[in-house]
């Protein structure tokens, strides 16, 4: 199974492909989709959509695992992250890729067994689980890989959106 993990954001959307081969996990394509801060929001969202659409067509993941929005104090930040997340979901839907959503708590519990784990602990576990030489950078890419690993582990109550293909 090929899992595309997504850490949505307007400035930086992290993505990471994790392939499940029996009980082993292997890292595939990963990186970040970047958008210029001074660019119009609609153009930034279109760029995220276009790049993610290209990645899905090239990598052909079996599923997309994406971070659920969590409580954010800053309403403006919540709105822009929600918009970026929306275009990620649209891209998956357009490509008939099943979507699974995970909260940050589920990701932390899946990788460390502790729901209040620090970001550095998550990154170290991504490195260890995927047998990487270094901690993946930037953080958004590491987070996307962590979300994909969470799906591979089958952690928590994954919420799949109903699809009829």
List where the protein language model places each region.
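Phosphate- and other anionic-substrate recognition elements at nucleic-acid/protein interfaces
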Residues: 1-165
